[in-house]
C-alpha cells in the first residue's frame, strides 16, 4: 500500500506544480506584453521627438532665412534711397543758409 500512496502523493505534487506553473505563465506573459508595450511607446516617443526636432530646426532655418532676406531688402532699400534722403536734407538746409 505504501508504494501506491507514494505514487499518488508524487502525482499530486506534480499536478500542484503544474498548476503553479500555469499560474505563473500568464503573469510572465503579462510581463512580456507590458515590456513590449513600454518598448513600443518609448520607440514612438523617440521617433516623435526626432521628427519634432527636425520640424523645429526647419522652422528656425526658415525664420533665419526670412529675417536675413528682410535685412537684405532693407539694406538695398536704404542704399537706393539714402542718396535721395541726403540730397533732400541738403536741399532743405541750403535755402535756409542762402536766406541769411
UniProtKB/Swiss-Prot annotation:
InterPro entries: Apo-CIII, Apo_CIII_sf. The record marks 41 as: May interact with the LDL receptor. It is found in: Secreted. Keywords: Chylomicron, Glycoprotein, Lipid degradation, Lipid metabolism, Lipid transport, Secreted, Sialic acid, Signal, Transport, VLDL. Residues 1-23 form the signal peptide. It holds the Pfam family Apo-CIII. One of its GO terms (molecular function) is high-density lipoprotein particle receptor binding. The most abundant glycoforms are characterized by an O-linked disaccharide galactose linked to N-acetylgalactosamine (Gal-GalNAc), further modified with up to 3 sialic acid residues. Less abundant glycoforms are characterized by more complex and fucosylated glycan moieties. O-glycosylated on Thr-94 with a core 1 or possibly core 8 glycan. Residues 68-100 are annotated as: Lipid-binding. GO terms for biological process: cholesterol homeostasis; lipid catabolic process; lipid transport; lipoprotein metabolic process; negative regulation of high-density lipoprotein particle clearance; negative regulation of low-density lipoprotein particle clearance; negative regulation of triglyceride catabolic process; negative regulation of very-low-density lipoprotein particle clearance. Glycans are attached at residue 94. GO terms for cellular component: chylomicron; intermediate-density lipoprotein particle; spherical high-density lipoprotein particle; very-low-density lipoprotein particle. Transmembrane segments: none annotated. Belongs to the apolipoprotein C3 family. Component of triglyceride-rich very low density lipoproteins (VLDL) and high density lipoproteins (HDL) in plasma. Plays a multifaceted role in triglyceride homeostasis. Intracellularly, promotes hepatic very low density lipoprotein 1 (VLDL1) assembly and secretion; extracellularly, attenuates hydrolysis and clearance of triglyceride-rich lipoproteins (TRLs). Impairs the lipolysis of TRLs by inhibiting lipoprotein lipase and the hepatic uptake of TRLs by remnant receptors. This is Apolipoprotein C-III. The gene is APOC3.
Amino acid at each position: 500500500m505504501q508504494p501506491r500512496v507514494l505514487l499518488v502523493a508524487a502525482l499530486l505534487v506534480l499536478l500542484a506544480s503544474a498548476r503553479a506553473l500555469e499560474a505563473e505563465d500568464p503573469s510572465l506573459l503579462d510581463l512580456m506584453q507590458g515590456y513590449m508595450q513600454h518598448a513600443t511607446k518609448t520607440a514612438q516617443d523617440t521617433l516623435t521627438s526626432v521628427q519634432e526636432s527636425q520640424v523645429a530646426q526647419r522652422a528656425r532655418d526658415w525664420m533665419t532665412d526670412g529675417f536675413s532676406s528682410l535685412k537684405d531688402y532693407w539694406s538695398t532699400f536704404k542704399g537706393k534711397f539714402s542718396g535721395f534722403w541726403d540730397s533732400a536734407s541738403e536741399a532743405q538746409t541750403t535755402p535756409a543758409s542762402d536766406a541769411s
